[in-house]
């Protein structure tokens, strides 16, 4: 469960390491984001020679959350950290690699590129 001011790790190779959530997309009263939801983020920590710079604003999709997500079969999935993947204006991945496992819910939300590049889909 990610909300405004939440800090997340970045699970791709764009050069960003940590981001701060500015907004959860999907309506004015939308408070929380879970796996597969889009958020607006500000880059707080980045590598010196990466594609993104510190302070830049971008959109991202949440790929892992510490708060468990309930599935249709009654099982739950949770991860050790909150992580996201940065997106460009067209809604496509900015990076070319994904680090760490991602949730199967991304496939249902049509983020096929992220699912195909991830080393493990849980």
From Swiss-Prot:
Disulfide bonds: none annotated. SUPFAM superfamilies: Ribosomal protein L14. It holds the Pfam family Ribosomal_L14. This is Large ribosomal subunit protein uL14. Belongs to the universal ribosomal protein uL14 family. One of its GO terms (biological process) is translation. It comes from Flavobacterium johnsoniae (strain ATCC 17061 / DSM 2064 / JCM 8514 / BCRC 14874 / CCUG 350202 / NBRC 14942 / NCIMB 11054 / UW101). The keyword Coiled coil does not apply. Part of the 50S ribosomal subunit. Forms a cluster with proteins L3 and L19. In the 70S ribosome, L14 and L19 interact and together make contacts with the 16S rRNA in bridges B5 and B8. GO terms for molecular function: large ribosomal subunit rRNA binding; structural constituent of ribosome.
């Amino acid at each position: 469960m990610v909300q405004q001011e939440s800090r997340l790790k970045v699970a791709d190779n764009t050069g960003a390491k940590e981001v701060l959530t500015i907004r959860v997309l999907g309506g004015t009263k939308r408070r929380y984001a879970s796996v597969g939801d889009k958020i607006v983020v500000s880059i707080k920590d980045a590598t010196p020679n990466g594609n993104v710079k510190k302070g830049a604003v971008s959109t991202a999709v949440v790929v892992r959350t510490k708060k468990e997500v309930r599935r249709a079969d009654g099982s739950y999935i949770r991860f050790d950290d909150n992580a996201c993947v940065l997106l460009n204006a067209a809604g496509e991945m900015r990076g070319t690699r994904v680090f760490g496992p991602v949730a199967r819910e991304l496939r249902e939300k049509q983020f096929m590129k992220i699912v195909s590049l991830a080393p493990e889909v849980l």
